């Protein structure tokens, strides 16, 4: 497969590696971008936290809650200008509130009735596109609910009540004091916003993700030239560290790095007055995994001048 300049550029942006290293990585992996990232990591040239690449979609994240149930939605727009528009912000809040009455899936939210218009959310967004003059889409949504407990929420970079660039839900099961439970839940939600854990517990991490990390660690360890039995111990140690870093409960608590999140929750049980279980987390970062289409600015100006 021919390695193009655009492919090299994309890999450089995702990894921070040099141009020649990126070109070699793509050649070695037959142009497979993810495999090329792993190749660079195995050589110690790229770090895992660079893999996600750039995010560039505009819009807002909206959150709505009702104690033991909460939802988070992402509505994208083409420009940040529209995201600052009062009508758009009200639309995001409204869709989040409508989502509370559904199972939280995009399909269910889209079909639900939007009270202010009497139409479906999908048709209401279409009407908003015509009114505001810019394309919009309900891209993602998530819902968490517990029978006895709270779903704490947190919005980072808030643009107003319940809307912002990053939204987090943390579901806590407990029969204890709900106000105290929500307080620790909000702290954990802020932690999730900052650290982006892959799962609540290490046992819940996608086996494919864990296997991929193990393979990278094996290649890195082999470069040391040590015997296989030593390499196996090195890899096991790195995997333990990996799980500690990406599983919520084993992470160092942002509010107090001297204790884990699990220890902080255990400590909070004293004020809550009952055991606490983390039932789930949801984290939506605006535009995550979306890249704006690159454009030629000079060509845009020329086209505008002709128009």
UniProtKB/Swiss-Prot annotation:
Its main location: cytoplasm. GO terms for cellular component: cytoplasm. Residues 79-82 are annotated as: Involved in Mg(2+) ion dislocation from EF-Tu. Disulfide bonds: none annotated. It holds the Pfam family EF_TS. One of its GO terms (molecular function) is translation elongation factor activity. Keywords: Cytoplasm, Elongation factor, Protein biosynthesis. It is found in: Cytoplasm. InterPro entries: EF-Ts_dimer_sf (IPR036402), Transl_elong_EFTs/EF1B (IPR001816), Transl_elong_EFTs/EF1B_dimer (IPR014039), Transl_elong_Ts_CS (IPR018101), UBA-like_sf (IPR009060). It comes from the Bacteria. Belongs to the EF-Ts family. Associates with the EF-Tu.GDP complex and induces the exchange of GDP to GTP. It remains bound to the aminoacyl-tRNA.EF-Tu.GTP complex up to the GTP hydrolysis stage on the ribosome. This is Elongation factor Ts. It comes from Sinorhizobium medicae (strain WSM419) (Ensifer medicae).
């Amino acid at each position: 497969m021919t390695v193009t300049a655009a492919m090299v550029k994309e890999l450089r942006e995702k990894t921070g590696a040099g141009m020649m290293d990126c070109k070699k990585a793509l050649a070695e992996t037959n142009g497979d971008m993810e495999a090329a990232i792993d190749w660079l990591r195995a050589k110690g040239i790229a770090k895992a936290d660079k893999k996600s690449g750039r995010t560039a979609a505009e819009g807002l994240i909206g959150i709505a809650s009702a104690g033991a149930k909460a939802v988070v939605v992402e509505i994208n727009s083409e420009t940040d200008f529209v995201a600052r528009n009062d009508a758009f912000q009200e639309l995001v809040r409204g869709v989040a509130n409508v989502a509370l009455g559904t199972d939280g899936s995009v399909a269910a939210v889209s079909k639900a009735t939007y009270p202010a218009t009497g139409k479906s959310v999908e048709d209401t967004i279409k009407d908003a596109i015509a009114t505001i003059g810019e394309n919009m889409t309900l891209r993602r949504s998530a819902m968490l609910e517990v029978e006895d407990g709270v779903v704490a929420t947190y919005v980072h970079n808030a643009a107003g009540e319940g809307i912002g660039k990053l939204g987090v839900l943390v579901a806590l099961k407990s029969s204890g004091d709900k106000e105290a439970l929500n307080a620790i839940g909000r702290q954990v939600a802020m932690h999730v916003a900052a650290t982006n854990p892959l799962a609540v517990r290490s046992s819940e991490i996608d086996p494919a993700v864990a296997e991929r990390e193990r393979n990278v660690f094996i290649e890195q360890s082999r470069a040391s030239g040590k015997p296989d039995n030593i390499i196996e111990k090195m890899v096991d140690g790195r995997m333990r560290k990996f799980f500690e870093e990406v599983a919520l409960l084993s992470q160092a608590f942002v509010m107090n790095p001297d204790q884990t999140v699990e220890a902080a929750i255990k400590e909070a049980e004293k004020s809550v007055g009952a055991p606490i279980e983390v039932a789930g987390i949801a984290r939506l970062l605006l535009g995550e995994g979306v890249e704006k289409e690159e454009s030629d600015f000079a060509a845009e100006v020329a086209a505008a001048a002709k128009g």
